[in-house]
């Protein structure tokens, strides 16, 4: 709704809209070296939903009247060249102060990368219809051609929900987005990763969940996101999924489809340059089918498009050809990238300003990418040889940079140049996965499609197992050569699915084919996993006896001499833990003595073992005050995040009423990153989610759902089953 004049002369609407947008930024930016892109001419035009030429007349009038001022400044994320930016003056603010905004209800809260609001033209009926459906509790798939304005309409609907006090959780998809990534956008860092836990944490009445750009999902992750939407469909929140037709998951169950078409002729006119006469405007709008992006890209200096000319053909024949060589080079670099880029990341920055001035780029903060229609048209114009050459050049360029993101980019371009390098993947995939396992999964999936190398498929299977993706892991395991490696992965898959008996049978078969040293290592790893495969609390005596007998049966002498001490250490740690839990003081003392002899009395780990012994002696369900004081000091002194978490968990287990310092200590490590490629860390992560459910009872169900998922990912099916039982009893 337009503001109403309370006193004084009314400014033209175009000028009022400019002033209202500029007034959202503080006066301190008038002398700032770096200013937001929204104050640049392309950013201002974008937010107002007009072409840049439509700003010239109202801006000139506002500047002549002293309502705005212009200067050259560096635009954040826009490269090194200074650009013209616009500021509202005190006089401009005074002019706005005479305007009275309609009263609004308390504004709701938004989460995630919610785009900047822009003014829509000719979409009032669509916005009202879509808003009415969502606010009434429906779930909707918003579909349409690329560039037709789906995201802009979704943003307008989100604004309507916010103005009515709703909570809006927004996620935008890319090729590396998975269900867990959507959860982080909806809920923030530390969000759960399983679909059921994500929905449990984000669901609520008067809540709108938005999933934008769903067509960008890689097939590797589409099924997981579809599962997320299936989980959300019957819940309290309304869900808006936005996708180019057809969507990667069809029309989800419980969703209705809302197809967005081109603009009507009377509304298309407002997107053309202001100096376009009415006859030309009608012909152009009809020729381009009312397509909003194509209309914004048309210039009055160009020929009127042929009637019936497809929008894609118009983009290729006209928009692309008007670019300079520098603009085309920068556009190609954007188009081959797997994700949006900062301008500072470009190797060919010269054409970035030209692309921005031409309304070819879309922005999210400082990250930019071409509008997807333009990107798709440009990609489609390349021959296979041209595409291969571009990717090969980009791979070489990114190889000169450091860091996991650079390796992700290098890997993408290497694979898409048709030359997946198994040795390179083996060397770098863990660093990529540690920063973004979803990106690593996509990279491996692309490499598997192009290479017959067994090691690449093994890496793809291992990553799927670590991520808890049973179906994907199985598809890769089935294509591996028969042997020990395949059997061990099949055993992991069985445990992931909760079939411990089959897993044990497969492992026994695999061990029969191992060397004695390999068999010993596998036995120790199995013992450690079985010891951890339970919820916090006293160990079952039967399990304790089984593990003790199994530990005593391990033949350490079969290991190479250099590895025997670490093998003995692992077994003695298990013996010590079991003895403490069942109250077997003599056995605990023997294990402690063996550990002290192996590590030395002054080793930092001995202090931890001594503390565990003191914590095991409890009165009334709680460890002594002296033991808790020592625990607090030891926790605060530990820098290793894994060790600190294990200590915190040990103290939580030793107390029925948890002191404030302990609760705060756990909160401080609740979202600290752990390595998914390490089995020990996967188990630790599952236990951490369990304790979050204990300490945060209002979110217990969501946290424990995630804990169940994490226990399965850690191959702890017994702990997962036990926790499911506790959840059922709690409900």
Can you annotate each of these PLM segments?
Residues 65-69, 313-381, 389:
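C-terminal boundary/linker of central alpha/beta nucleotide-binding cores
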Residues 101, 107, 322, 363-365, ...:
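A structural signal for repeat-array scaffolds
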Residues 177-196:
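Conserved NTP-binding/hydrolysis module of P-loop NTPases
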Residues 168-178:
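A short hydrophobic beta-strand->loop->alpha-helix junction that borders the nucleotide-binding pocket
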Residues 123-126, 152, 224-298, 310, ...:
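Alpha-helical sensor/transducer elements of the RecA-like P-loop NTPase core
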């Amino acid at each position: 709704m337009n503001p109403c004049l309370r006193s004084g002369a009314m400014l033209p609407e175009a000028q009022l809209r400019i002033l209202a947008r500029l007034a959202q930024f503080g006066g301190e930016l008038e002398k700032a070296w770096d200013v937001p892109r929204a104050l640049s001419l392309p950013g201002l035009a974008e937010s107002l939903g007009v072409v840049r030429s439509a700003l010239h007349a109202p801006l000139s009038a506002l500047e002549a009247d002293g309502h705005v001022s212009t200067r050259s400044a560096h635009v954040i994320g826009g490269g090194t060249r200074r650009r013209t930016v616009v500021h509202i003056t005190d006089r401009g603010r005074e002019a706005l102060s005479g305007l009275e905004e309609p009263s609004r209800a308390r504004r709701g809260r938004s989460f995630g990368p919610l785009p900047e609001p822009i003014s829509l033209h000719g979409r009032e009926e669509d916005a009202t219809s879509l808003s009415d459906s969502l606010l009434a509790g429906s779930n909707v798939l918003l579909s349409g051609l690329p560039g037709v304005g789906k995201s802009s309409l979704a943003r307008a609907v989100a604004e309507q929900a916010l103005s009515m006090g709703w909570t809006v959780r927004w996620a935008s998809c890319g090729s590396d987005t998975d269900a867990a990534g959507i959860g982080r956008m909806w809920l923030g860092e530390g969000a759960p990763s399983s679909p059921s836990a994500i929905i449990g944490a984000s669901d609520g009445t008067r809540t709108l969940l938005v999933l934008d750009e769903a067509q960008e999902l890689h097939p590797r992750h589409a099924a997981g996101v579809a599962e997320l939407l299936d989980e959300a469909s019957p819940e309290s929140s309304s869900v808006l999924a936005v996708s180019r037709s057809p969507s990667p998951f069809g029309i989800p169950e419980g969703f209705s489809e809302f197809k967005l078409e081109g603009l009507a002729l009377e509304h298309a006119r407002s997107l053309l340059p202001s100096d376009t006469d009415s006859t030309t405007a009608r012909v152009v709008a009809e020729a381009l089918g009312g397509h909003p992006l194509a209309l914004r890209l048309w210039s009055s200096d160009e020929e009127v498009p042929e009637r019936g000319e497809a929008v894609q053909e118009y983009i290729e024949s006209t928009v692309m050809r008007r670019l300079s060589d520098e603009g085309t080079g920068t556009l190609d670099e954007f188009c081959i990238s797997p994700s949006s880029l900062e301008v500072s990341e470009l190797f060919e920055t010269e054409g970035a300003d030209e692309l921005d001035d031409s309304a070819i780029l879309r922005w999210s903060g400082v990250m930019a990418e071409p509008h997807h229609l333009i990107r798709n048209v440009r990609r489609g114009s390349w021959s296979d040889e041209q595409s291969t050459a571009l990717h090969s050049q980009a791979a070489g360029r990114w190889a000169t940079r450091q860091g996991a993101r650079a390796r992700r980019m290098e890997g993408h371009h290497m694979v898409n140049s048709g030359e997946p390098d198994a040795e390179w993947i083996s060397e770098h995939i863990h660093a990529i996965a540690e920063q973004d396992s979803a990106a690593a999964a996509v990279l491996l999936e692309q490499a598997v499609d192009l290479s017959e190398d067994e090691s690449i498929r093994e890496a793809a299977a291992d990553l799927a197992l670590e991520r808890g993706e049973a179906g994907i892991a199985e598809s890769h395991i089935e294509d591996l050569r028969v042997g020990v490696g395949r059997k061990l992965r099949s055993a992991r898959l069985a445990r992931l699915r909760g079939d411990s008996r089959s897993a044990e049978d497969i492992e026994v078969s695999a061990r029969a084919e191992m060397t004695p040293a390999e068999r010993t290592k596998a036995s120790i790893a199995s013992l450690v996993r079985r010891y951890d495969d339970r919820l916090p609390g006293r160990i079952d005596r039967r399990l304790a006896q089984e593990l003790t007998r199994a530990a005593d049966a391990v033949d350490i002498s079969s290991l190479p001499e250099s590895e025997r001490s670490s093998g003995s250490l692992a077994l003695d740690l298990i013996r010590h833990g079991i003895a403490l839990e069942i109250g077997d003081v003599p056995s605990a003392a023997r294990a402690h003595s063996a550990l002290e002899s192996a590590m030395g009395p002054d080793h930092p780990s001995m202090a931890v073992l001594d503390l565990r012994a003191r914590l095991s002696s409890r009165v009334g369900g709680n460890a002594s005050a002296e033991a808790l004081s020592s625990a607090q000091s030891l926790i605060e002194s530990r820098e290793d995040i894994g060790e600190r978490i294990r200590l915190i968990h040990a103290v939580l287990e030793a107390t029925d009423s948890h002191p404030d310092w302990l609760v705060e200590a756990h909160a401080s490590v609740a979202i600290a990153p752990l390595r998914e490629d390490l089995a020990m860390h996967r188990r630790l992560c599952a236990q951490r989610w369990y304790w979050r459910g204990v300490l945060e009872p209002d979110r217990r169900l969501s946290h424990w759902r995630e804990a169940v998922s994490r226990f399965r990912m850690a191959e702890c099916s017994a702990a997962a089953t036990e926790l499911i039982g506790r959840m059922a009893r709690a409900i």
